[in-house]
Amino acid sequence: MAASVSTVGAVNRAILNLNGSGAGASAPTSAFFGTSLKKAVASRVPNSKVTNGSFKIVAAEKEIEESQQTNKDRWKGLAYDISDDQQDITRGKGMVDPLFQAPMDAGTHYAVMSSYEYLSTGLRQLDNIKDGFYIAPAFLDKLVVHITKNFMTLPNIKVPLILGIWGGKGQGKSFQCELVFAKMGINPIMMSAGELESGNAGEPAKLIRQRYREAADLIAKGKMCALFINDLDAGAGRLGGTTQYTVNNQMVNATLMNIADNPTNVQLPGMYNKEENARVPIIVTGNDFSTLYAPLIRDGRMEKFYWAPTRDDRVGVCKGIFRTDGVPEEDITKLVDTFPGQSIDFFGALRARVYDDEVRKWISGVGVDATGKKLVNSKEGPPTFDQPKMSLDKLLQYGNMLVQEQENVKRVQLADKYLNEAALGNANEDAIKSGSFFK
């Protein structure tokens, strides 16, 4: 018992010594505390040498200097903001009286986007796009001129805010845009057709305004930016009588029209301020702009560009697709001329088909029942393949197979048969006629 009491007393004396009291040096000499602790004690207690018998209490250093805090502090709003994106005006409902929701800054509607290093979900990083891809000269000229013109102040000239790029499916509209953005050093704010519809009325229109203001905030910080909307006609257009035209379709068209007319005064619903935002060029892609609301695509609001790649453009893009496979340029030219009616995307799918043989060899080697264990839960890592040799004959063979699959989809049209006949009806008739049914 006496031993335990003496131990406690020794510990208490050691603690007092750490705080600069008692006899002797303030820092203990025992190796138990280590050199790092001695350094820490010396830094925390500047006046370590004191007279014997005195007891000195040293206050801890201030860890936060209030005078050094700035308005650009990234986390400053955590004490006041209860939303997760500082913009969602619907989360403020029910927390304050609707009469005071907008003008009193009480809720989460206050849409100030100058938060320090704002983290965005719509910002697209294009740093991974490397050299070697072909950019069509006409495409590059149209996009660069439109973006540059929107950042200039031209005398007595009304510049259309929106550039609409439309054309056939799979012709590389979106990818060419990304290549131009990368060449200009622009990280665009991205949207797609799937974001132009919602279960809540007005949400897509509000999202467009939010993304536009986000791009404007980046421009105000000195970074070139643009708003890029993919497949606008798929989300806001009318594709025949079976398409349901909703309030959100109307609101998306009306919002884009309003932004095109007032590009420096884009407000969120319920929140209006007098400060002008930066002008942001908008680039949209689509397949058929005749399905859009006609006043939206008039010349003063939208500049239209029909993208139909020439033979030279198709050959140039295909050289980029096969650039790592060692395919001679004359073979690429012959391949493009063999399938003149196919989209550019067809040649990318054709290249992917060549790897099917390598995948079959790997599956036969590990067994069908072990593919899941090898691919998902393997300690060996993912499988690696030697790059297959792509000869012109093999590419033509797989190309004809893809064309045959396209013809089957157009020719058979089983949906019409299912609607007109009971059960399968004559669904196998096509296979019987082609001779592949009894193989």
UniProtKB/Swiss-Prot annotation:
Question: Which superkingdom?
Answer: Eukaryota
The family line of this record is: Belongs to the RuBisCO activase family.
Q: Which residues bind ATP?
A: 167-174
Give the CC-aspect GO terms.
chloroplast stroma; thylakoid
Report the subcellular localization.
Plastid, Chloroplast stroma
Any one Gene Ontology MF annotation carried by this entry is: ATP hydrolysis activity
- What name appears for this protein in its UniProt entry? Ribulose bisphosphate carboxylase/oxygenase activase, chloroplastic
This protein's encoding gene: RCA
Q: Which keywords, in A-to-Z order, does the entry hold?
A: ATP-binding, Chloroplast, Nucleotide-binding, Plastid, Transit peptide
Per its database record, what is this protein's job?
Activation of RuBisCO (ribulose-1,5-bisphosphate carboxylase/oxygenase; EC 4.1.1.39) involves the ATP-dependent carboxylation of the epsilon-amino group of lysine leading to a carbamate structure.
